[in-house]
Amino acid sequence: MRLNFKSLPELLAFNIKYYRYLNGYSQEKLAELCKLSPRYLTDIERGIHCPPISRLDVLAKALNIEPYELLLNVDRDKKIIQKMKSFRQYNQK
């Protein structure tokens, strides 16, 4: 399933959330691994902040991927995307 993104920060935000979900990390855990504040990571995932390249490298290493993968719009597993949406809705209650 290929998604449409309006901007690079939106694509980056989705990919960070996607790979974070695949790794089973909470925002707090990923922030800790990357030595970021949880609030800053939340803002990245909401597309409010676009991190510098040096941070992309740190995020990618923590997510067990190559940095360029954070910037790719490729087909994603529809089932995983649905699980991510369900998880997000559950956590917002």
Predicted features and spans:
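Conserved hydrophobic/aromatic packing and binding residues within compact polymer-binding modules
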Residues: 16, 30-31, 41-44, 70
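Short amphipathic helical patch at the helix-1/turn junction of helix-turn-helix
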Residues: 10, 21-22, 50
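DNA major-groove recognition helix of helix-turn-helix/homeodomain DNA-binding modules
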Residues: 54-69
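Recognition helix of helix-turn-helix/homeodomain-like DNA-binding domains
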Residues: 35-49
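Short basic helix-loop element that most often maps to the first helix and adjoining turn
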Residues: 14-33, 58, 85-93
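A detector for short, charged/polar N-terminal pre-domain segments
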Residues: 1-11, 81
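Short, charged recognition helix plus adjacent turn
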Residues: 71-93
